[in-house]
Amino acid sequence: MTSQVVPLSTFVQHLESCEGYEFRTMIKMLASPAYAKQQLLKDELSVFMAKVLKLLRSKDDYQVWKGCHIATVFCTYNPVVLCSFGGELMGILYRALEDATKYYGDSVQTEQRKVMVRALVKTLDTLMDLIRGKPSLTREALTPHLSAIIPMLISFGRCEPNLSLPVIKKLLSKHSTTFRPHVGKLKQLLTELYGHYQSLDPVTRKVVCDTAAYLHLTQKPGNNANEHQAHHKSFPDEHWRAGLFSVLSQFGPVVRLWGEILDIGSDENLARLLETLPRDTANDTSPLLPALTVDINKPVTLWHISARLEQLTDMVESFIRLPTLFPTRIPLGELVKVSEILLSLTTNYLPLKRGLRRDAALTGSIRSALPETQLQGIRLLRCLSDHIGKNLITYMPAILSSMELFIPLKDKKTSIDYQKCVDLQNGLLQLTALMNSIAQHLGHKVEEMSLAIKLVDICAYIIEHKQNLDSAFSSTSGTAKAAGGAKKKEYKAKTGSMSDLFSHPHKFLHPVPLENYTVVNTYYNMALTHWKLPSTQQAKITKYCIYYSLSFKEKLGYIPQTFIELLNTIVLFPGKDRFSILPIAVHLLKETGDPVFDVLCNPKLPLEMIQIRRQPTSSEDDTATSEAEEYAAPADQDDEHLSDDEHTTVDDGVATNAVMGLNNLVSSETLRSEQDSALETQHPEQARTSNLVPDEASEGREDARIFKKRSSSDEQDPPSKRTRAVAAQTPVPAAVPVDNGEPESDDGSDFEIPEIELSDADEE
């Protein structure tokens, strides 16, 4: 062993007595690869592991807890220890956990013992994960102990299902064949947990449903009980699909209970869908659900219907999202049909039955239970959209029309009841999240925009409405007025002081969670980028974004990222009115800055643009060479190099800039007209000098402007232009014919000599 690490013999001396900081430091040092040497097995490593095994056999809970952590770290980072002592550690951990859980439910458990049991379960789970996948270790250390570990975990699941069920779920998926003898005990455990399902925490409920779904992996594929169907091909997901249909078949009887309260027959489409739901199918693997008791004389029992539908939805979600070793066939049509039926159960369009009494307790229970029933349809669609995605495109019209049924409406009206929206805040936010999920597959063309527009108004109202104190104010003042003078003091003594409601009403407001802002901002981003919203909704989103961005900046000192993204979207997609909030957005983000706003405020063209250059012809190359030589002439040369008929003054900087322009700018060919080509052929000197004409409007300036000479043939061959750097040319007036006393046709030739007008400078 190297001298840079502490010898294991030193740890052995302080292993039982160390605690606190010493123990944490020892754990960190044991992760060093310096201890992963096979030479240490003969002396130090064997002595150290013997001490760890002694800690795990101890009757002291704290010593067992320390042994669990040392075994976890040492086996994770030291493969030598895992291969040498993995099987022995598995046996000791199993026996320690069995002793700790044998009388776990009968005796009073202290917090210290619960922590020790939790450490034993976590260590056993980690050790099995480390051994799994290694052929020799799995065969020698893991498989022999599974037959004893599985029943022990199932028995412990009755006391601590949140600890044992995650391990059982993993064993079901990884060792389904080894688990087959214990399926009956696990099914009995899950049936007991289903009996008090609503008393479990959400995480445990999710694990219970996942474990029930994985039970279908233990059945042998291709085991067809019907001998007449034995010749058909069997699929690997046959039992998985049967379990899913077994759960779907239980929706029908529960939904039909609402048929005793609501007049479902008034909606022919809903009644037809309800009749086509899957019927009850026998499945021996699925755990049994307890009987559902509903008494209309006890209106509160109507909530049991929503609770059972929530449990069934959790079970269906497990079948959809859990990974399997084989592809699964999901019945999309049946799942969409179930969600559509659940969302259609609303008093907005379905009246109560005529023979039903209308007392406040019954109607109130019905109106509170129906939204929870609809919410399960939203959850089911959300799960399908997240895990199946674009396969739902063919069902989108039915899905969108069903989603709109969840929005509460006023009685016998089509306007939104915003007061009910406050009570259904959680469900409406889940509806918005569902819209965000399916919008990724909808695209930009949506025929019906009513749902999108309604959600914009509802989200803005939910976020802005904190708590309704107006009713408290009105009821307090009305009660005080009703009380007489003598009774007013007695009323105040009973009710207490109500002055804080009037003097500090903001102290009674509940803050909106940031998760709600995230859902709303995501929906607004999606709506602005995908669809053209009306001006009213566009202005409402803009006002909401500016107000809360400024509010968060003042209270928290920063603007959340979702609001920054919404500001960018509003600037880039201004809507139909085309008004821009760019100055306001830049002011809000002036401290942190934003790359999008920086580009909009300071646009910059890309440098060294790459274009296509065409190889010039021989005549064009000679012309370009002569022009380059002319522009590259030194500044101290006489003006004799210029034409005698025209005096052009060129500054030194102009010539230098012209040469640099020829080197850096992208050259493009200039096509000349037939007349210019003829003139250049006959009078090359005159053609070269005529391109340099002094600009009278810019005399005295140091630099001349660079322009491109265009011809009528530019449109024919635009990619093959060439660019020359020349001085700016002013329009030349039309030439006045000179009368030389000879007729114009004396020459008899077809060529016409151009007439040159001398400038005033030449005359002088």
From Swiss-Prot:
Subcellular location(s) per record: Nucleus
Pfam families in alphabetical order: RIX1
Organism from which the protein derives: Eremothecium gossypii (strain ATCC 10895 / CBS 109.51 / FGSC 9923 / NRRL Y-1056) (Yeast)
Task performed by this protein: Component of the RIX1 complex required for processing of ITS2 sequences from 35S pre-rRNA and the nucleoplasmic transit of the pre-60S ribosomal subunits. Regulates pre-60S association of the critical remodeling factor MDN1.
GO BP terms, alphabetized: pre-replicative complex assembly involved in nuclear cell cycle DNA replication; regulation of DNA-templated DNA replication initiation; ribosomal large subunit assembly; rRNA processing
Keyword set, alphabetical order: Nucleus, Ribosome biogenesis, rRNA processing
Broad class of the protein's primary localization: nucleus
Biased composition (Polar residues): 670-680
SUPFAM superfamilies reported in the protein's UniProt record: ARM repeat
Biased composition (Acidic residues): 619-643, 741-764
Disordered: region residues: 611-648, 670-764
Subunit structure: Component of the RIX1 complex, composed of IPI1, RIX1/IPI2 and IPI3 in a 1:2:2 stoichiometry. The complex interacts (via RIX1) with MDN1 (via its hexameric AAA ATPase ring) and the pre-60S ribosome particles.
Protein name: Pre-rRNA-processing protein RIX1
Family: Belongs to the RIX1/PELP1 family.
Regions of compositional bias (Low complexity) in chain numbering: 725-738
Gene Ontology terms, MF aspect: chromatin binding
Cellular component terms (Gene Ontology): cytosol; nucleoplasm; nucleus; rixosome complex
